[in-house]
Structure formats: C-alpha cells, structure tokens
UniProtKB/Swiss-Prot annotation:
Gene3D superfamilies: 1.10.150.530, Aldolase class I (3.20.20.70). [4Fe-4S] cluster binds at residues 134, 138, 141. This is Dual-specificity RNA methyltransferase RlmN. The active site is at 114 (proton acceptor), 370 (s-methylcysteine intermediate). The gene is rlmN. Residues 120-365 form the Radical SAM core domain.
C-alpha cells in the first residue's frame, strides 16, 4: 500500500507541497525554530539555537555532523526535519568582482531565480530575490518581461544568503565579505510580505547572519498599505523605486502608481520614518533613461519632491536619491542616459541640497546589473527549458564522471 504523505504547514500558514512531510528548518526564524523544538520534538528551546548556528554559521545541513547534539536528538531531527537549500544550477563571476548565481527552487527545480553579490570598498552587498518573476510590469525592468510565477518561501529567500555566505566563507564575528543584503532582486518583496520579513529576521539575528538592521534594505515599487505594515514589524532600511517625480510619467514607467500615486507613497514613507527613532532616511531609486526622465526639469521636480519630504518628516536628508544608469537588456526600447546628462542631473539635485549618489554599474557583463535579473531568458517557457537542458547536462557530466 502506498504511503500517504501529509502536507506540512509553513510558518506563514501556507501548505507545503506534498513532496515532503518533514519541516525544512530554513523556513523558520528563531521563534519558529524554538517552537518546533518545543512542540514537535519535545526539546529545550536552546537546542534550536545550537542547530540554527550549525546551519547559518557553519553551513552544515546534515544533522549527523552537528556534533554537539546527542544521538537521540539527531534521530528525532532525521525523522521530523530537514535542511533543504537551493540548488546552484550555475554561478558566474564578472570581471569587476560581481558574482551571480542561478538557483533552482522547489523539489522539482522547475523554477529558478538569480542572486547577485557585489563587492565594493569595505563592503559586500548581496542582492536577493523574493519572487520567481514579477507581476508589476515596470516597463524598464527585465524581470517584468518573464511575468510572475510564484512567491519564494522563507527557505528559498534565506537560502540565497546561505549559498552566497558559504561561497564567500562569511562567518559572523570574523572578517566579513558579506556585509549588506538588499531585497532588490527579482520580484516585489512586499507582495511576499510574511516570508520576506521572516527571512530578514534571520539575516539580522546573531544566530543567523548577524547583520544590523540598517544593513538590510527592502526595496519596493510602492505598495502603500504594506509599507505601513512593515513599519510595525521590522526596522530594516527602506528604499523606494521612484524613477519619476510626477504621476503622469511614473504611471508610464511603474503601473502601480495608478493605484498608489506619488503623494500617497511619500506620505507612507514619512510614516515609516516617524514610526521608529532607529530610522533616519529613505532612499529613492531613480533609473535614468535617455530622453525619458533625465531632463533638467525632471531633476528640478525630484529636488522639490525631496525638499517636501524632508519638511514632512522635519529632518534634513530624510530623502536620499540613488541615481541608477539604465542597464539595457534584449528587446527594451530604453537607452542609458549619457554620462554628461547623468552628472548634470546630479548637479541640479546637489545644488538643491539633496543628498545624491550615482550608482556604479556593476556586473552588466553577466546580466547582473540593476534591472537585468530575469532567470537568464525572456519568458517562463524558455527559462524552464534552459533549466532542463542545464540540469540534463549536469546529469550527463555526473554519469560520465
């Protein structure tokens, strides 16, 4: 008689697919792991802390290698739990030190996302995805061309950090190569709220990756109600994909603006800052596209918007601007603004006393630059076909070996 596999319930209440009845411990933050150890295993909560450090500090996924656990506890863990990390389909370094991973997600490996590590002077930033694809249809973003497939689980989000940290040899309390995480990869993080917040909790936990709240940044296209909810549940840094300072232009670039126009978005950002003394600024991302949003009048509109935001929060430099040169991708109608236009745009903002940075383009030789992440191909069908070919190639190589 065939064994009936009962789906398990994830921490956010969603049902795990029936391929496994074991609890993936990567799906749990400290609180969830403590509860699992107490309620399911009948073990002391401190045991959860030991396992959490094995997973996130030492990158150990085999319970038998967790040598400070007794044999009986390891047996219970084998019976009720597992640690499933994303499968690395391939990883690709850039000439400038940027590194991109293509990670297969789920038991069948049919979905995949891209994760990018960007080193810089004194810091190393990991750009993490929250969804397979994206449904917001921002016209200048490569990810939008493939449509939306599904949300990532907590395990699949924090698993990206696990893969990168293991590759980098990143160990808390020693020299760090991974110092910052930005939720700026594929997908809209606030549309996968519970899983993203839980994963960010592990990133900031000393038993996890020990990052300060200000070193974890969530970037959103502007889901106003979820920004308000985030204000009550997390103290991470907030970044907003703005890209235009007037509603008419922004609606053509970011369709979500039709539902949450700029005035409502800026009010929610002000509420976010006022919600905690730990928050002192919001970063507004502005992708510069030739002849679209890079003219002097656009810069003056943005400067006025930033001054209004500072006044609303009653704090100087509450709004910071990050100018991003557009990164082209196949099929786009947009072009990158010239260096002269970029510097002229920045000068108008600086002259208006708006704190403004120009993001250095990194990883564009491996399609890892901002706006280029899309699972390597233009749509889901072709993307999944590529995964199958890649995985079949891996199987052939393994068989030959």
């Amino acid at each position: 008689m065939n064994e009936v596999v009962i789906p398990s319930v994830l921490q956010d209440g969603s049902v795990r697919p029936p391929e496994s009845r074991k609890q993936n411990l990567l799906d749990l933050d400290r609180e969830g792991l403590e509860r699992f150890f107490a309620d399911t295993l009948g073990e002391a909560r401190y045991r959860a802390h030991q396992v959490m450090k094995w997973i996130h500090h030492r990158y150990v996924t085999d319970f038998d290698q967790m040598t400070d656990l007794c044999k009986a506890l390891r047996a219970k863990l084998h019976q009720h739990a597992e640690v499933l990390v994303p499968n690395v389909v391939f990883d690709k370094p850039s000439a400038d030190g940027t590194h991109k991973w293509l990670l297969a997600m789920g038991a069948d490996g049919k979905n995949a996302i891209e994760t990018v590590y960007i080193p810089d002077k004194g810091r190393g930033t990991l750009c993490v995805s929250s969804q397979v694809g994206c449904g917001l249809n921002c016209t200048f973003c490569s990810t939008a061309t493939q449509g939306f497939n599904r949300n990532l689980t907590t395990a699949e989000i924090i698993g990206q950090v696990w893969v990168a940290a293991r590759h980098l040899g990143n160990v808390p309390h020693q020299q760090r190569r991974l110092t910052n995480v930005v939720m700026m990869g594929m997908g809209e993080p606030l549309m996968n709220f519970d899983n993203v917040v839980r994963a960010m909790s592990v990133m900031r936990d000393d038993l996890g990756y020990g990052l300060a709240s200000k070193r974890v940044t969530l970037s959103t296209s502007g889901l106003v109600p979820m920004i308000d909810r985030l204000s009550t549940e997390s103290d991470v840094s907030l970044a907003v994909s703005l890209h235009a300072a007037n509603d008419t232009l922004r609606e053509s670039l970011v369709p979500l603006n039709k539902k949450y126009p700029i005035a409502e978005l800026m009010e929610s950002c002000a509420r976010y800052l006022r919600g905690s003394k730990k928050r002192d600024s919001v970063t507004f991302e502005y992708t510069l596209m030739k002849g679209i949003n890079d003219q002097p009048e656009h810069a003056r509109q943005l400067a006025r918007l930033m001054r209004q935001f500072d006044n609303a929060v009653q704090s100087k430099d509450a709004g910071k601007v990050n100018l991003i040169p557009f990164n082209p991708f196949p099929g786009t109608r947009y072009e990158r603004s010239g260096e002269t236009e970029i510097r002229a745009f920045q000068k108008i903002l600086l002259d208006a006393q708006v704190l403004t940075m120009v993001r250095r383009t990194r990883g564009d030789d491996i399609d890892a630059a901002c706006g280029q992440l899309k699972g390597q191909v233009m749509d889901r069908t072709r993307r999944q076909a590529e995964f199958r070919r890649t995985l079949e190639g891996q199987a052939d190589r393994d068989a030959a070996a």
